[in-house]
Amino acid sequence: SGWDRQRIVDALIRETEVDVVTAQEISREVEELISSSNISMATSPLIRELVDAKLIERGLEQARKRHTRLGMPLYDVDQLILHPNKENANVPHGPEATNLTLAERIKKEYALLSIFSEEVADAHMRGDIHLHDLGFIDRPYCSGQSLEYIKRFGLSLPNSIAMAKPAKHAEVLLAHMVKFAAALQSHFAGAIGWDAVNLFFAPYLVGMRDEEVKQLAQMMIFEFSQQAVARGGQAIFTDLNLYWEIPRHFEDVPAIGPMGEYTGKTYSHYEHEAQRFAWFLFEVYREGDGSGRPFFFPKPLVHITEKFFRTRGHREFLHHICEVASQKGNTYFVFDRGETAKISECCRLSFKLDASDLEDAQQPWKMRYCALQNVTLNLPRIGYLSGGDNRSLFERVEEFMDMGVRAHLEKKAFIEKLLSYGENGPLALLAMKRDGSSYLRMHRASYLIGMVGLNELVQIQTGKQMSESQEAFKFGLKVIAHMKLLTDRLSESHGMHFVLEQTPAESTAYRFAKLDLEYHWQKAHHVVKGDIPRGEVYYTNSTYLNNGAVMNPIERVRLEGLFHPLIEAGSLTHIWLGEAKPSKESLANFVIKTFKQTQNDQIAFSPEFTTCNRCHRTSRGLTEICGYCGSRDVDGITRITGYFTRISSWNKGKIGELHDRYRNQGFLRVAGKEEKYEGKMVMLISA
């Protein structure tokens, strides 16, 4: 529409609030520069860059920031479209995935320039802390909810072109659940967790034959597994919380059945139907998909409680889910000891229920929880900066945590602003009030403070890793206990629920290690794990012991479990099985021992598989050649953090960790009632 210098003036005044005289001077200088350069076509991006240069010349850095154009270089976009993004192994490669990544890149820049303060943004950029899911700055992290919400209110979503009344049949309830999960996935950055799924389906299963219940179980698992058409081509990161018994807090709760109506009974009357559904879900998991591969999603989390062991059929069910754990690795064992009750999701996150939550259990549709954001601290960085001085170390822990809290306050303010627009705003789904209060209950939100590299921090301070000496291990406990004390103090002072979390750190452990090798090479190269020449570097995740430490698996579970009472937002210990396929009896004994003799919150047994892209068959263990057809066109499958995925999608840091993992080959074999460990034990700590 022709050149008009006034547009530059208007944009500068509107966006940067510089005075009119300065804006006019800059517009004239840019016009002269374009005229003298013989540029045939002055595009908007070019003009904006020239204006930014003039702002920098005048020392107007804040104005330059506000005037910045967000985007990506042409070369980066070209690479992005041609090559897969390995930052998240759950994102496939395709047009929808590149759309997601492009949008994420812009929102990341927006978050760091506009939402977070310069101090917080700088702390993230230099690697003191990590702000997770910056590309999803306009949504909370993850959520836990109840099927009772859609059973009671149907599928009535803001901006939807059709409204569905409460389901009459189990298949329709499942369809509502999947659709609602997809809608929630587009409003949360992380996992979508569902509480007591088998129990809340139970009133719909009365009178159904076993074949019909199994078909429903099959539909559920395949529907969630094949939803790789949702956000960015991703499968919905779904967690199903399952119980063999009726949880105490749901025993006397009136049951909601077809059409959203009360059945006249409490949930304690539906134990048999709930157990049938749980049993058949694990039958489907045991069979695997059409190629015999384990299902990546939805993830089944079985709660093991005191009541579990008093419930009829628990031994058979425990053997059943342990057989699935051995053959396919799907089962997560969540330990709710004493009076504890929680909803678990997202690799290891859990929402522990307090007295007010248990009151909400009388109306389970109110039981909706979210973690608003996850901020992770680079613990080895604290070690490098402290120079071996313990007092300095604990002071820096406090400084880093204060920066994390500041990031949470800034994200909270932004989300509250978006929610203030209600059902006409960008977070309409989370602002909807079907039961009189917003779907996202901000007063119940948690704010996560995670950690990476405790093992390396301890190594820097004591000269030993946590698996190498009792003194080193106890120092690690002291650091986390100090962080727990700080989160409690910060929660009280800010009136917010700050909690420690074991960050999954799929890419963060790699990012921190790379940055520290760049900025603190002299110290970092002694403690960073992996293969430095190949760039396959990482820090030990959260509070874990070294992945490669050779030790009895029950001792690893016991020692790592000593941290778990301090980490309110959830913890997990992996037992890497490799090719081993232990008996269901030995795994069941292991689970019982973990429940009764340790403080561990959650465990998962993780086997490894090779899947062939030619003959589509799957075999145990990681191999370079298909054992069936001899093809080299194969891919490995195992857990990257808290979920299964193809190894070809992993980043370099996770590849380095995979090489180092100590597999418990031979694991445990039952001899009478005793377990015999066949591996080599390096050390046992009495802690």
PLM feature spans:
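Core of folded catalytic or high-affinity ligand/protein-binding domains
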Residues: 439, 443-450, 654-655
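Charged, amphipathic alpha-helical regulatory modules used
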Residues: 1-85, 89, 659-663
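Catalytic-loop motifs flanking and including active-site residues across diverse enzymes
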Residues: 4, 8, 193, 447-454, ...
